[in-house]
Amino acid sequence: MSLLPHLILYLTLLTVVVTGETLRPRFYSETCPEAESIVRREMKKAMIKEARSVASVMRFQFHDCFVNGCDASLLLDDTPNMLGEKLSLSNIDSLRSFEVVDDIKEALEKACPATVSCADIVIMAARDAVALTGGPDWEVKLGRKDSLTASQQDSDDIMPSPRANATFLIDLFERFNLSVKDMVALSGSHSIGQGRCFSIMFRLYNQSGSGKPDPALEPSYRKKLDKLCPLGGDENVTGDLDATPQVFDNQYFKDLVSGRGFLNSDQTLYTNLVTREYVKMFSEDQDEFFRAFAEGMVKLGDLQSGRPGEIRFNCRVVNRRPIDVLLVS
């Protein structure tokens, strides 16, 4: 069988690596006009199959974009020569529903082969996760390329832990030109979804090495968490991140005001005087939260590494280079 068609296709993709594009709305209006509709359709299917999955997919944008920009490096599986980001400290046993992105990519490849990047899928799917659960809808800028590699170490070095305090989070977000308001609004992504007992055991039983629970926890809520996450129990048990875990709303901020934040990194936003004003604002004004969240997601989506990229056929692996085709044929 002739290798020429394969070589032509892969050489075409190699030109993509070096050309790059400016992000813009409706990027696929000519090359794949139904791209955004296809992504939303697949997200609806995922939501029907498992409601929690859309919250899981929404988190991909944060965990991807903070590590060397929005390039779908998060989606790459480990290889013998590369430790990717899926097993980094902030992602292992935490991020899930990668199969939803697989399904979206498969649908897009059928409609528009080798056209829509996995990095753009992450951005569109995150937006749709919010909109489909009652939150804001916004126009996304597209035209990203997929990374050629990933780094577990880079993820470990950048991503915050559930123990992070507000001061650390402020400094982290400032590194990416995201304001305090952006940071607090984007933390509202925890309006939907669940977290593991593993992430809060120290809050319940040994906050700051005291051997005591976090004093910021409202007593009745602490008792609820004690029952959910007993000392010595299964740390993979999950609990709701706010009182309305399947609805994107401002209940998350109301819970923080009342001392019912699930994660330390959430509750610290209310105990810190710099971030408290935004928590109170969003708890009282859902429309303002929605506006700030959408603006923050757009800013987050603008983070780019400037590294070479491609349009992956499979979001879990980089494309074979022409030399790879020759070696295995």
Curated annotation (Swiss-Prot):
Substrate binds at residue 160. Disulfide bonds join 32-112, 65-70, 118-315, 197-229. GO terms for cellular component: extracellular region; plant-type cell wall; vacuole. Its main location: secreted. Residues 1-19 form the signal peptide. GO terms for molecular function: heme binding; lactoperoxidase activity; metal ion binding; peroxidase activity. The record marks 59 as: Transition state stabilizer. The keyword Cell wall biogenesis/degradation does not apply. The keyword Ion transport does not apply. Removal of H(2)O(2), oxidation of toxic reductants, biosynthesis and degradation of lignin, suberization, auxin catabolism, response to environmental stresses such as wounding, pathogen attack and oxidative stress. These functions might be dependent on each isozyme/isoform in each plant tissue. There are 73 peroxidase genes in A.thaliana. This is Peroxidase 17. The gene is PER17.
